[in-house]
Amino acid sequence: PSDRVTVDRQAEGQQANRVTILLNKPLGIVSGQAEDGHAPAVSLIQPSNRWRDDNARFFFHPSQLRGLAPAGRLDIDSTGLLVLTQDGRVARQLIGEDAGMEKEYLVRVVWTGADNPAAATSAAATHAPLRPTLRAPSVATPLGLIDEGDPVTRDVQSVFPRERLARLRHGLSLDGQPLKPARVEWQNPEQLRFVLTEGKKRQIRRMCELVGLKVIGLKRVRIGRVMLGHLPVGQWRYLAPHERF
């Protein structure tokens, strides 16, 4: 029995020493392993990149990089809150089969008016660039002056049909599977706020393309109860002991 107690205490100590890190991932950084010359997110976890306002009472040590892995992912062309952890319990909570953790995103869009049905079955379909006719005028362009086929870049909310907003909330399918209901609201005339409880590959970009929108900026700002807050792009902080997803 005494041997078991010793082992249990050692296990508890090892678990307590495992860190979870919150990173504001920049554009051009991949979440997992390095690929196509792009650096992985873990390469940013260095003392020089630690947020100076991080008040968690942890000291950085290279051993904290051992086994540190992303719990979920952000596309290379997305920014915002990315969780890296050594703790399997945290990983299961965030990306386990029955996780259902809320994730909140701010999504800047333009209205193309052209649905992209290929996005329903292929994440790669969202990589196609906008047509060269895309313009961002210094003042809002009167709708009557927009040529047919031109993307609308200003006051998208005013031209985006309400029934398509309803489809974003519920009614779309990806890869042959119906999506779970999502909370989708206009944050401002060019930006939507998405709250999802699932995470298919390039899900938001594909959802938008199915209803005639093109995503031109995507930032994750919340996972569960943990907010991105004022964490600067490219910097990181520790998840404090009192914080819970």
Describe the residue ranges of each PLM region.
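Basic, flexible Lys/Arg- and Gly-enriched helix-loop patches that mediate nucleic-acid binding at interfaces
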Residues: 1-245
